Amino acid sequence: PSMSKDEILDSLFGWKGKKVVLWMPTFRKSDLGGCAENEIELPCQLPAIQDMNELKELDSYLREQEIILIIKKHPLQTEWDENEQEFTNIRYVAEALLEKKQIKLYELIGISDGLLSDYSSVAVDYLLLDRPLGYVLADYNIYKEKRGFVFEDPLEYMPGEKIYNACDIRKFMKHLTDGTDSYRQERAKNLKQMHNKTENYCKRLADYLQL
């Protein structure tokens, strides 16, 4: 059976709190040659964060609000030591830790109360949960220049708060705790565009497999 929210948090961090936010930034630095993303420089390997002081201030705010921010490292991301767990309410996880604890990535996604993403397809998957989304777009222009997007205007497909700095991250957290959800209708609209059929998954799969 799947682990409960409290069981997963206790297994990973020995932590319980009011809210869980998962941050899944796409990679900017990797060992893959020829990747345009490798030219994007970020001080803390996180968009919207200028330095460690901002992370410390954010950690303090999260502690006051009893929120844990779990930053999931992209498998291709380099120059990032997620083993340095120097914060109380900002915690890093990578594939190795999840495997060690026998926790699937989508179990972690499933227990989160909100998701911070950017240009990653995980935000499309998250629409199925109908929970608040934040899009961290601090390097939007340079990412568009170096990597490019599939859609002509990707912002049309981002039904959530647009985040450009640490202050915006705190606003997202505040809205999450006080129940402010201004993008519910936009998420529903995007859900219909991105997920053609969203009902009776098990029955349709069983019918397809002729069970």
Segments (PLM) and residue ranges:
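Conserved catalytic-core segment of nucleotide-activated headgroup transferases in glycan assembly
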Residues: 1-86, 199-202
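Short, charged, surface-exposed secondary-structure boundary motifs
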Residues: 1, 101-106, 144-151
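C-terminal alpha-helical cap of glycosyltransferases
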Residues: 197-211
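Catalytic binding pocket for nucleotide-activated donors in carbohydrate/polymer assembly enzymes
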Residues: 88, 121-194
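Generic beta-sheet signal
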Residues: 72, 95, 136-138
